[in-house]
Amino acid sequence: MTNNTPEWNNWPDGFIWGSATAAAQVEGAAWEDGKEDSVWDAFARMQGNILNGDTPETAVDHYHRMPADVALMKELGLDSYRFSTSWARVRPGGRSTNTKGLDFYSRLVDELLEAGILPWLTLYHWDLPQALEEAGGWANRDTAHRFVDYANDVYSALGDRVQHWTTFNEPFCSSLLGYASGVHAPGRQEPRAAVAAVHHQHLAHGLAVNELRARGAQQLGITLNLSNSIPRDASDPVDQEAARLFDSLQNRIFLDPILRGSYPEDTLQDLEPFGLGDVIREGDLEVISAPIDFLGVNHYHDDMISGHPDSSGGDGHSGGSGRQPASPWIGAEHITFPSRGLPRTAMDWEVNPDGLRKLLVRMGEEYAALPPLYVTENGAAYEDTVQADGSVPDGERTQYILDHIAAVGRAVEAGADVRGYFVWSLLDNFEWSWGYSRRFGIVHVDYSTQKRTVKDSGLAYSRHIAASRPAASGTVPARSVAPAV
């Protein structure tokens, strides 16, 4: 059978099917049990930063509804749940340990294991303690060392039960969107600080990998959001150069230090005016390139790039707020993102499933030291509503997910070493500067009652997981609703 649909079933032994969330987007309980402000709590309080003035204060109340949410994961048949721990909950001021915060994650891990679900832990999904931001944030090299203290706390509490440890999720966002464009927390628009943040997050990653490896961790990795960079006109030198710049800032500035132990030469030259060379110290790149056991790939869409003015495809860096963002493309602020006329999600992102196949195959072709890959986020935002019969029809999201799963299968057929797929997201949640206006979940959340209702996409994903197992057993319920509690 050729892999034109997800019914293709030659998945590698042990292939993991999961779903993902992030602490700041789902937990709520913003100041409960010792937690203090993260940069996102502080950012959301500033008028105009978040669409509709939304905040993550309550989110989807996962902090209080966690056991029911884990039961829902079990009902869906997930192999794994990818979640993040909140630095602002574990070390509220960035420097002292909060045992109540760690206790929550210990209970979560125990619930997952009891349900037969593999915990997949991310240490940093953008919620830096506000106190550390006030000390300079990621532009301050000391923050990398404070991250190791935090990682050690989490490992001490959970290392006996958690196998998979991801240091960072999408450092592109927490550095370039947070410190250059300002559309993400902490909302700074300082290119030199953004470049320093990139390097210091790399350094924090490497320091944590070495520290946790020494303590016995066996599966250590990082998750990067990666995209194909496609020149609008491959014969046009202006478009070729724009595509090179985009690839440098979106992909290679993150991949190369980790996998090759060096920044790309063109990136060093491009960012020399913004201080990249100034923040690199002797020995840093040896630390940063510490071997990893897996690489998480987050991918939602790829991008056509031009060096000519073109507003047909958006600006490539806006968020949901009315705040005027700067460009995250430091030194390449002129690049544009022409539309290809493809269908678009509610995020205004083009839908091109084959882009994921191309990306996964390209990774293996370009990086000799590439570890096994996991697609750690892939999903789509669309408008959806609970119907009178209790259903949540979301055919566009369902098709998006199944088409991208098929693309992963084609990449595996082509030789890509991909070992898992996590749909984003398990639950509708706080979508950063878009607030609650964009829904990615395969489970609908009524934000007024916190009632969970599995969408058609969740049911389809559950059926796919069951069909993909060598010896499928049991049936997927026709409809599943988790009540408000």
Language model segments and positions:
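Active-site region of glycoside hydrolase catalytic domains
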Residues: T2-I50, K74, P92-R95, L102-V485
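A common structural microfeature
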Residues: G14-I16, V60-Y63, S80
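Active-site mouth loops of central-metabolism enzymes
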Residues: L51-R65, W138-R141
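Internal amphipathic alpha-helical repeat/solenoid segments
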Residues: H62-A71, P92, G101
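Catalytic domains of carbohydrate-active enzymes, especially glycoside hydrolases
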Residues: R65-S86, A290, F294
